[in-house]
Amino acid sequence: MNTITLFFLFIPILAVILLFANLLLAVHRPDSEKVTPYECGFSPVYGQTRNPFSIQFYLVGILFLVFDIEILLTYPYAMNLYQTSTYGFWIFVIFFLVLTVGFVYEFGTGALYFTDKRSSIQNTKISDSKHSPFFWSKSEKRL
């Protein structure tokens, strides 16, 4: 029997056996605290679902996703580093330059600030000269 065939047969069978063993042997003690929804550190919302919350959570999630995908795409390149041609190297350099420019832009617009006046949630226009994404005014201090 082929090794891959063995894995395709053995792993699902083992998973089903372990799931049924868990259902049969696990202690079931339902509690009101255990069955309540947990919503990212907030109290569960009952009734009205239109409560205000900070949009920064979504912004951080999207930024995390973008840079997590960057790491995911970097790993195969790192594994084949010695087999990559000059063309592949320059494609990778351009990839990192685009991500670096994006990070500098996010930092400049204040997307990474939560409690500062420079937060991007204030809907400042990037076209304004005093709100340029790459420069701060003289009255603002950089961290």
Swiss-Prot record:
Descriptive protein name: NADH-ubiquinone oxidoreductase chain 3
Entry keywords, A to Z: Electron transport, Membrane, Mitochondrion, Mitochondrion inner membrane, NAD, Respiratory chain, Translocase, Transmembrane, Transmembrane helix, Transport, Ubiquinone
Signal peptide coordinates: none
Record-stated family: Belongs to the complex I subunit 3 family.
Stored InterPro entries: NADH_UbQ/plastoQ_OxRdtase_su3, NDAH_ubi_oxred_su3_sf
The protein's role, per its UniProt record: Core subunit of the mitochondrial membrane respiratory chain NADH dehydrogenase (Complex I) that is believed to belong to the minimal assembly required for catalysis. Complex I functions in the transfer of electrons from NADH to the respiratory chain. The immediate electron acceptor for the enzyme is believed to be ubiquinone.
EC numbers on record: 7.1.1.2
Swiss-Prot/TrEMBL catalytic activity: a ubiquinone + NADH + 5 H(+)(in) = a ubiquinol + NAD(+) + 4 H(+)(out)
